[in-house]
From Swiss-Prot:
Species this chain originates from: Chlamydia trachomatis serovar L2 (strain ATCC VR-902B / DSM 19102 / 434/Bu)
Gene it is expressed from: gpmA
PROSITE patterns, A to Z: PG_MUTASE
Protein name, entry field: 2,3-bisphosphoglycerate-dependent phosphoglycerate mutase
Site (Transition state stabilizer) location in chain: H179
Biological process, per Gene Ontology: gluconeogenesis; glycolytic process
Pfam short name (any one): His_Phos_1
Role: Catalyzes the interconversion of 2-phosphoglycerate and 3-phosphoglycerate.
Catalyzed reactions: (2R)-2-phosphoglycerate = (2R)-3-phosphoglycerate
Length: 226
C-alpha cells in the first residue's frame, strides 16, 4: 500500500485575523500549532518516506510539528537541493533515522496579488461581495496582479507529476504539507473533478487527507485510516 498524505497547514496568524495571505510568509497561530500537532497524531502510524512542503514557513512548521510524535521516531531533515553538499549525511546509521524534506515554491499558496494583507470583509465592502466571490471561488478569474486557481495548478501539477509522482510509483509514501489552493488544484487532478466541482471543495486547516496509490489510480481513504 503506497500512501499520499495531503495536509493544509494549521491556522496562520493571518487566517486568524481574516486577512488574505497568499505568498506573504506568515507563521502559525497558537491554534495552528495545536492543529498541526493534532494532525500528526492522526497520521502517526502511517508510513512516511518523503515530505514535501512549500517554501512558506506555515507549511514547513506544520510538517515539522506533525512529525514530532510519529511512530517511526524518524527526524525530518531539510534537503537544500541548490546545495546538496550542505545536507549530505555521511552516517548510514543516522540516515536510517531520517526522513528527507523537500521545499518548492511550486507548492506555495495561490498568490493573491493586490489583496494580500487586506481584510476579507473590508475587501468585500470595497469591491462588492460578488466580485470578491469571483476572485476567491471562480476557477479562471484572478484578483488584480494575482493568480487564479487555474494559474496555481499550472505550477503545482507539473511539479507533482515530475517530482512527486515518480516516487509514488517507486512505492514511496509521501506527505505533502501545503496550502488550501495549491492542494485544491492537486485534488482536482487526483479526483478528476470538473471546474464546477472544484469550486465547492473546501479544505479545513490541519485535517489530513489520505489517498492510496494502487498503481492504477488514487483511492481516497476514510479519515480514520491513521
Amino acid at each position: 500500500m503506497t500512501l499520499l498524505i495531503l495536509l493544509r497547514h494549521g491556522q496562520s496568524v493571518w487566517n486568524q485575523k481574516n486577512l488574505f495571505t497568499g505568498w506573504v510568509d506568515i507563521p502559525l497561530s497558537q491554534q495552528g500549532i495545536q492543529e498541526a500537532i493534532a494532525a500528526g497524531e492522526s497520521i502517526k502510524h502511517l508510513p512516511i518516506d518523503c515530505i514535501f512542503t512549500s517554501t512558506l514557513v506555515r507549511s514547513l512548521m506544520t510538517a515539522l510539528l506533525a512529525m514530532t510524535n510519529h511512530s517511526s521516531q524518524k527526524v525530518p531533515y531539510i534537503v537544500h537541493e541548490e546545495r546538496p553538499d550542505m545536507s549530505r549525511i555521511h552516517s548510514q546509521k543516522e540516515m536510517e533515522q531520517m526522513i528527507p524534506l523537500f521545499q518548492s515554491s511550486a507548492l506555495n499558496e495561490r498568490m493573491y496579488g493586490e489583496l494580500q494583507g487586506k481584510n476579507k470583509q473590508e475587501v468585500a465592502v470595497q469591491f462588492g461581495e460578488e466580485q470578491v466571490k469571483l476572485w476567491r471561488r471562480s476557477y479562471r478569474i484572478a484578483p488584480p496582479q494575482g493568480e487564479s486557481l487555474f494559474d496555481t495548478g499550472q505550477r503545482t501539477l507539473p511539479y507533482f507529476q515530475e517530482r512527486i509522482f515518480p516516487l509514488l510509483q517507486q512505492g514511496k509514501n509521501i506527505f505533502i504539507s501545503a496550502h488550501g489552493n495549491s492542494l485544491r488544484s492537486l485534488i482536482m487532478d487526483l479526483e478528476k473533478l470538473s471546474e464546477e466541482q472544484v469550486l465547492s471543495l473546501e479544505l479545513p486547516t490541519g485535517q489530513p487527507i489520505v489517498y492510496e496509490w494502487t498503481g492504477q489510480k488514487f483511492t481516497k481513504h476514510a479519515p480514520s485510516l491513521g
